[in-house]
C-alpha cells in the first residue's frame, strides 16, 4: 500500500515551513491541500508559498486555476489521486480537511448536477417518493430542497448515497500530522499575519481581482471582508476585526473536524522538539514494512 504523509493544522501554525523541511529531508513532493491556494491571483490573502520559500521542492495543484474557473471537491479528488499515482513520495499540505479526506479515503464523488430552476413543492414530493423507493436506507433532510434534488440526481445516475459508507476506510497507508497551537498564541499570530498581509498589498490584491475577475469567488475569509471594506460597508478596522474573528472560529471548527474525522498525530506546533519528533515519526513510517 502506498505511503502518504500529510501536514494539517490551522492557519499560521507553521505548516509551510515544516513541510519544506520534511520534503527536503525525505525527498518528497508536495501536493497542495488548501482549497483557496489552487487559484491564481489569490496570493497574499491565502498566504500562498512563494517560489523562494519552496527552496526547490516541487509543488502540485498550487496556483494553477484562473480566478473565475469553477473547481469543486470532486475535481480535487480526481486531480489529487492522479498525482498520487505519478508521485513516488507525496506529502499533502493544507488545512482543507474535506479535500484531504476526499483524496485519501475510499469513496467516489460524482459531479454536482446542474440544479433545475423553480422546482415546485409537487416536484420535490415526487423526487422524495422515488428516493424512498430506490434508496430506502438513506437518511435525508427532507426540508432541504437542494439535498433532495442532489440525492434524486444521484439515483438517476445510478449512485445510491446510502451505499457510500466507506468514508473512513483509507486507500493508502497514512501518517497525518495536525499542528496544534495554543489558542492565545494562534490569535497573536493571526493578528500579526493579517497586518503583514495588509502591508504587502492585500487590499490592492482584492481590488485587482474585483476589477479584472468580477465572477471570481469572494466567499473566502479575508477576501469577503476586504471586498466589503472597498465597497464602503465598514471601516478597515472593522474588516480586520471580522477577519480575525472568523479565522479563529474556523480554526476551532478545523481542530474538531480533523480530530474526529482523520485521527491525526497531534503535535505541539510550539514545541522546541517539534522538528525532531516529526522527523523521527516520518522516518519510522517510511521505513516500516507495510
Curated annotation (Swiss-Prot):
The gene is miaA. One of its GO terms (biological process) is tRNA modification. Catalyzes the transfer of a dimethylallyl group onto the adenine at position 37 in tRNAs that read codons beginning with uridine, leading to the formation of N6-(dimethylallyl)adenosine (i(6)A). Gene3D superfamilies: P-loop containing nucleotide triphosphate hydrolases. Keywords: ATP-binding, Magnesium, Nucleotide-binding, Transferase, tRNA processing. ATP binds at residues 9-16. Belongs to the IPP transferase family. It comes from the Bacteria. Its EC number is 2.5.1.75. SUPFAM superfamilies: P-loop containing nucleoside triphosphate hydrolases. This is tRNA dimethylallyltransferase. It catalyses: adenosine(37) in tRNA + dimethylallyl diphosphate = N(6)-dimethylallyladenosine(37) in tRNA + diphosphate. Substrate binds at residues 11-16. One of its GO terms (molecular function) is ATP binding. It comes from Phytoplasma australiense. InterPro entries: Dimethylallyltransferase, IPT, P-loop_NTPase. The record marks 96 as: Interaction with substrate tRNA. Its cofactor is Mg(2+). It holds the Pfam family IPPT. Disulfide bonds: none annotated. Residues 34-37 are annotated as: Interaction with substrate tRNA. Monomer.
Amino acid at each position: 500500500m502506498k505511503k502518504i504523509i500529510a501536514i494539517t493544522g490551522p492557519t499560521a501554525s507553521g505548516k509551510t515551513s515544516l513541510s519544506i523541511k520534511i520534503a527536503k529531508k525525505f525527498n518528497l513532493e508536495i501536493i497542495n491541500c488548501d482549497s483557496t491556494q489552487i487559484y491564481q491571483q489569490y496570493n497574499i490573502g491565502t498566504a500562498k508559498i512563494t517560489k523562494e520559500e519552496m527552496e526547490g521542492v516541487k509543488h502540485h495543484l498550487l496556483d494553477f486555476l484562473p480566478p473565475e474557473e469553477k473547481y469543486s471537491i470532486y475535481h480535487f479528488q480526481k486531480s489529487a489521486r492522479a498525482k498520487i499515482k505519478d508521485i513516488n513520495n507525496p506529502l499533502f499540505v493544507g488545512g482543507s480537511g474535506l479535500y484531504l479526506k476526499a483524496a485519501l479515503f475510499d469513496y467516489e464523488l460524482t459531479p454536482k448536477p446542474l440544479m433545475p430552476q423553480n422546482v415546485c413543492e409537487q416536484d420535490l414530493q415526487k423526487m422524495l417518493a422515488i428516493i424512498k423507493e430506490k434508496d430506502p436506507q438513506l437518511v435525508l433532510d427532507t426540508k432541504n430542497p437542494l439535498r433532495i434534488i442532489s440525492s434524486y440526481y444521484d439515483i438517476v445516475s445510478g449512485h445510491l448515497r446510502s451505499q457510500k459508507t466507506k468514508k473512513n476506510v483509507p486507500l493508502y497507508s497514512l501518517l497525518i500530522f495536525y499542528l496544534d497551537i495554543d489558542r492565545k498564541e494562534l490569535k497573536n499570530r493571526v493578528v500579526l499575519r493579517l497586518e503583514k498581509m495588509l502591508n504587502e498589498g492585500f487590499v490592492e490584491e482584492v481590488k485587482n481581482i474585483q476589477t479584472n475577475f468580477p465572477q471570481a469567488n469572494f466567499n473566502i475569509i479575508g477576501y469577503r471582508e476586504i471586498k466589503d471594506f472597498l465597497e464602503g460597508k465598514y471601516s478597515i478596522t472593522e474588516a480586520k476585526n471580522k477577519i480575525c474573528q472568523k479565522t479563529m472560529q474556523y480554526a476551532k471548527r478545523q481542530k474538531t473536524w480533523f480530530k474526529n474525522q482523520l485521527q491525526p498525530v497531534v503535535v505541539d506546533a510550539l514545541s522546541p522538539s517539534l522538528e525532531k519528533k516529526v522527523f523521527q515519526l516520518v522516518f519510522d513510517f517510511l521505513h516500516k514494512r507495510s
